[in-house]
Amino acid sequence: MAVKIRLARGGAKKRPFYRVVVANATAPRDGDFLEKVGTYDPMLASDNSERVVLKKDRIEYWLGTGAKPTERVAKFIEQAGVTLPEKVKKEMEVKAKNRKARLSKKEAKEA
C-alpha cells in the first residue's frame, strides 16, 4: 500500500482550511485517511504560528515507514525542522527539474 502525507481540504467556500493527513495514495483527496498529523490555514498571516501546525513525532514515524509527502507538505515539514529522507529530497529535485524543462519547452513553443 502506497502511503502519502498530503493536504485534505476543509472549510467553506472561499475560506479554505486544510488538514495534513496520512492517507492511502489511491484514496480521494478529502476521503478516508489513516491519521491526521497537522493543519494548515492559508487565511492566516504568514508569520502567524498557527498557520501550519504539525505533529513532528508522528510525521517522523510515517516518513520512517516510507510515506511520501507531497511537494507542499514537504516544504511545511522542512520549515518545521524535520529532516526528509534523502530519497524524498532527490525525487523532489528531479520533479522540479522536469517542471522547469516543461515550462521552458512550453514557452519556446508559444514564442
Curated annotation (Swiss-Prot):
This is Small ribosomal subunit protein bS16. One of its GO terms (molecular function) is structural constituent of ribosome. It comes from the Bacteria. InterPro entries: Ribosomal_bS16, Ribosomal_bS16_CS, Ribosomal_bS16_dom_sf. One of its GO terms (biological process) is translation. It comes from Rickettsia rickettsii (strain Sheila Smith). Disulfide bonds: none annotated. Keywords: Ribonucleoprotein, Ribosomal protein. Belongs to the bacterial ribosomal protein bS16 family. One of its GO terms (cellular component) is cytoplasm. SUPFAM superfamilies: Ribosomal protein S16 (SSF54565).
